[in-house]
């Protein structure tokens, strides 16, 4: 009987059929609990080679559309059948397996630079090779690897990566001065306004007054500190060019701050700019516009 049993077993084992049946039986018994997930092969163009013996569902609620949504639009990855390679279209349900930086970032040392900063999954220099990746809890799950293996960071930067332009509150200020002082405040070729902007960082512009044609508006834009410093420089400039009197007064005050001299120096010298035709102060000028305006010095 034993010999006969061996003879009956030979034909099945000669071509490996006996081993195949044993493996299929074992695999089927261990995979019975997997009948809760759809078979990706069945719902693909290639079809499922296992037929009724497949360990995954061939009848899934929602059909192809539901399975396609799960596999292509970020749903949970479907486990492959035991002993087979995982499907290529399975989407990772979290960060990539590598948690350290193993490659150099090819954007770091370029002119445009790397826009991901500390959140980049590549090393910014050899010193970062092997450094753990910075995983932001607010970062959404990546939508699949790029051809280079670089998983996409979140599309929007975090508040900590906001642009420097948003730092510091922006404000505006307006100073009204006599229109005759505008030229002196601007300076030849805009030298004065450029200097104020360069030193304080505030933007400065001189525009017409809304209602009074005898006045000009000096408009300042920047942070509160920038406007404060620029306003102080503008007022010092107005005093230095002899515009210390308020805009309402049409006659200049006797006291002149030019050169720190006493008020008796008013109109005691000829205006050099007037002879060149470039005086911008007009009647407000503290120097004489011609011999007929010359006054004798009080010291004399």
Swiss-Prot record:
This protein's UniProt keywords: DNA-binding, Metal-binding, Repeat, RNA-binding, Zinc, Zinc-finger
Record has Transcription as a keyword: no
Positions of C3H1-type zinc fingers: 33-61, 99-127, 265-292
Annotated stretches, region: Disordered: 1-38, 243-262
Family annotation (Pfam families): KH_1 (PF00013), zf-CCCH (PF00642)
Entry superkingdom: Eukaryota
A single GO BP: regulation of gene expression
GO molecular function, one term: DNA binding
GO cellular component: cytoplasm
Domain KH: 170-234
PROSITE patterns: KH_TYPE_1, ZF_C3H1
Membrane-crossing segments per the record: none
Protein's name according to its UniProt entry: Zinc finger CCCH domain-containing protein 14
Upper classification of the organism: Eukaryota, Viridiplantae, Streptophyta, Embryophyta, Tracheophyta
